[in-house]
C-alpha cells in the first residue's frame, strides 16, 4: 500500500483512519473560560513512550456536554500531535480524563489491537517513517488528517496478540537492563563527587584565606549582545559551556558586541568562570578555561576570576566545584519569586578555602584528575551500552513489523477478510451529523433616520438575510 515492502501472507496494509477512530482534544482558550467547570486534562508533556505521567495535571474549563467528546477512556491510545510526533501511551485508568488539542485520541476497531498499534507507532517514529506525514520545519506536528493516512501493516488479530506478547517479554528484559545501566551511571556521577571529597580532605588542616585575597585583578562580569550571522561577529560563550565544562564552538555564538567595549573580556588559559545567575541547582557552577588565548569573550551571566601565584587555578576550580563550594553558592543566592537566583562578586570574594603549598595543591589536582579520568572511562562504557540498548530495541521492533518475530498460523483469519468485514460494517452505519453551535440572537439594528426632505416614496424594504450558523470547527 505504501510502496515500502511486501507483507507476509495473511497481512494487509491499511490506513490508520480506516481501522481506528481518531479525534483531537479540546483547544485551550483562556478567554472562553468561565471557571465554572475546571477539569484536569492531559497535555503533550504528560504522555511519554508507553506511560502517562498524571502527577502534574493542569485544568481548563470544559462544559458538561463537551466532556464525552474531549475525554479518553480506559483502553484508548493517546498520541502526541506535536514535538516528538507519534509518542504514545495507553490510558489504563478506569476513570476517564480530558485531553488537550496537542493530543490525538485513537480508538482501534476490532481488526486492530491497541498495544500492537502502540508498538508500531514507536517503530514508525524511531525508524523515520512518520516524518513524511509531519508538518512544520522546526517543531514538527502530526495533524489528524495526516495521522489517519499513516499506513499500518496489519496481521491477523491473533498474530497481533502473539507479537505483542513476545515484544513485551523481550522488551521488559531490555528495560530492566537499561534501568541497571542508568543506576550505574548515577553511581558513576557519585564517584566523581566522592573522589573530590576524599582528595580535598587532605588539605583540611591548611590555613584558609578568602578568595578575594587570592585574585590578581578585580573580578569581572562579562558582556552580552545580540546574536548575528556575520562571520566577523564576536565569539561569545553561552552558559552551557560552563555547565558542561566544554569550551567548543558549539557552546558559543557570534554577537554584535562592540570590539572596543569587550577588549578586556577575551579569555586566557586559566580563567575561572562562575555562573552568577541560573536555576537554584546551577547557580555558582564553575569551570576553568584551558583553551587558546583570545578565542572568545564571556557573557554577562558569568563572572571571571583570575588568581595570583599563591594558588593554582585548577586547584581553586576544584574547591569551587566541590560540595562545599556548591552549597556555599546555593545558600547565598538571592532572587525574587519567579526570577533566577543570583550571586554577586562579593559572594565569590568572601568564599574561604584552605590554601596549602603549591606542591600539595598540585598533588590534589593530579589525584582528582586521574580519578576523574577513570570514572569517565566507566561512564563512557555505560553510555555505549545504553546506545546499544536503543539499537537492540529498534531491531526487535523492526523484526516484529516485518513479520519475522512470531510464526504465521494459516488458521488465523486473514487481515484482508477482517478488513472487508469492518469496511462493510462502517458503510452500513448511518452517518452521524456533527452538532451545530446554537445561533446567537442578535439585536435588531435601529432604523436609520429619514432625510429631512425625502424625494419620492420610500422603497419597499428588502427581506432580511437568514442568519448564518457556523458549523463547529473540527478539532
Located regions from the model:
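Amphipathic heptad-repeat alpha-helical coiled-coil/stalk segments that mediate oligomerization
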Residues: 406-428, 432
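Short, ligand-facing micro-motifs at secondary-structure edges
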Residues: 46-59, 77-100, 115-119, 127-133, ...
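A short glycine-rich beta-alpha junction/loop motif
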Residues: 9, 81, 97-104, 112-115, ...
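Non-catalytic DNA-recognition/assembly elements of restriction-modification systems
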Residues: 1-26, 149-164, 169-221, 350, ...
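Sequence-specific dsDNA recognition surfaces
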Residues: 17-32, 45-74, 212-226, 240-272
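Short coil/turn segments at secondary-structure boundaries
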Residues: 29-37, 132-134, 208-209, 224-232, ...
Amino acid at each position: 500500500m505504501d510502496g515500502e515492502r511486501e507483507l507476509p501472507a495473511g497481512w494487509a496494509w491499511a490506513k490508520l483512519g480506516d481501522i481506528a477512530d481518531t479525534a483531537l482534544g479540546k483547544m485551550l482558550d483562556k478567554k472562553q473560560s468561565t471557571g465554572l467547570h475546571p477539569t484536569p486534562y492531559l497535555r503533550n508533556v504528560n504522555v511519554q513512550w508507553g506511560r502517562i505521567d498524571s502527577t502534574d495535571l493542569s485544568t481548563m474549563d470544559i462544559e458538561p456536554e463537551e466532556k464525552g467528546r474531549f475525554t479518553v477512556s480506559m483502553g484508548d491510545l493517546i498520541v502526541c500531535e506535536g514535538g516528538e510526533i507519534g509518542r504514545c501511551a495507553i490510558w489504563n485508568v478506569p476513570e476517564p480524563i480530558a485531553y488537550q488539542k496537542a493530543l490525538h485520541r485513537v480508538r482501534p476497531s476490532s481488526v486492530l489491537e491497541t498495544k500492537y498499534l502502540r508498538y508500531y507507532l514507536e517503530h514508525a517514529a524511531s525508524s523515520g517513517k512518520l516524518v513524511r506525514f509531519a508538518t512544520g520545519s522546526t517543531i514538527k506536528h502530526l495533524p489528524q488528517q495526516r495521522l489517519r493516512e499513516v499506513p499500518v501493516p496489519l496481521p491477523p488479530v491473533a498474530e497481533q496478540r502473539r507479537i505483542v506478547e513476545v515484544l513485551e517479554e523481550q522488551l521488559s528484559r531490555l528495560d530492566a537492563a537499561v534501568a541497571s545501566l542508568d543506576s550505574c551511571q548515577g553511581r558513576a556521577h557519585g564517584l566523581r563527587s566522592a573522589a573530590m571529597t576524599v582528595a580535598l580532605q587532605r588539605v583540611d588542616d591548611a590555613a584558609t584565606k578568602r578568595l578575594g585575597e587570592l585574585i590578581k585583578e578585580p573580578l569581572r562580569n562579562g558582556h552580552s549582545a545580540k546574536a548575528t550571522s556575520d562571520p566577523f561577529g564576536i565569539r561569545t560563550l553561552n552558559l552551557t559551556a560552563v555547565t558542561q565544562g566544554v569550551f567548543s564552538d558549539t557552546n558559543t555564538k557570534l554577537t554584535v558586541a562592540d570590539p572596543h567595549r569587550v577588549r578586556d573580556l577575551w579569555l586566557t588559559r586559566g580563567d575561572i568562570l562562575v555562573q552568577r545567575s541560573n536555576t537554584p541547582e546551577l547557580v555558582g557552577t564553575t569551570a576553568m578555561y584551558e583553551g587558546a588565548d583570545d578565542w572568545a569573550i564571556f557573557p554577562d551571566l558569568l563572572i571571571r576570576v583570575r588568581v595570583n601565584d599563591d594558588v593554582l587555578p585548577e586547584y581553586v576550580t576544584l574547591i569551587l566545584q566541590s560540595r562545599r563550594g556548591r552549597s556555599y553558592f546555593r545558600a547565598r543566592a538571592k532572587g525574587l519569586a519567579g526570577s533566577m537566583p543570583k550571586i554577586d562578586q562579593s559572594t565569590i570574594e568572601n568564599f574561604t578555602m584552605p590554601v596549602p603549598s603549591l606542591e600539595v595543591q598540585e598533588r590534589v589536582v593530579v589525584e582528582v584528575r586521574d580519578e576523574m579520568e577513570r570514572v569517565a572511562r566507566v561512564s563512557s562504557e555505560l553510555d555505549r551500552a545504553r546506545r546499544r540498548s536503543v539499537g537492540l530495541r529498534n531491531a526487535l521492533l523492526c523484526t516484529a513489523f516485518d513479520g519475522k518475530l512470531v510464526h504465521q498460523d494459516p488458521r488465523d483469519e486473514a487481515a484482508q477478510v477482517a478488513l472487508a468485514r469492518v469496511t462493510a460494517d462502517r458503510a452500513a452505519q448511518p452517518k452521524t451529523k456533527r452538532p451545530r453551535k446554537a445561533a446567537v440572537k442578535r439585536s435588531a439594528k435601529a432604523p436609520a433616520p429619514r432625510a429631512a426632505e425625502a424625494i419620492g416614496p420610500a422603497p419597499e424594504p428588502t427581506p432580511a438575510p437568514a442568519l448564518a450558523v457556523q458549523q463547529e470547527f473540527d478539532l
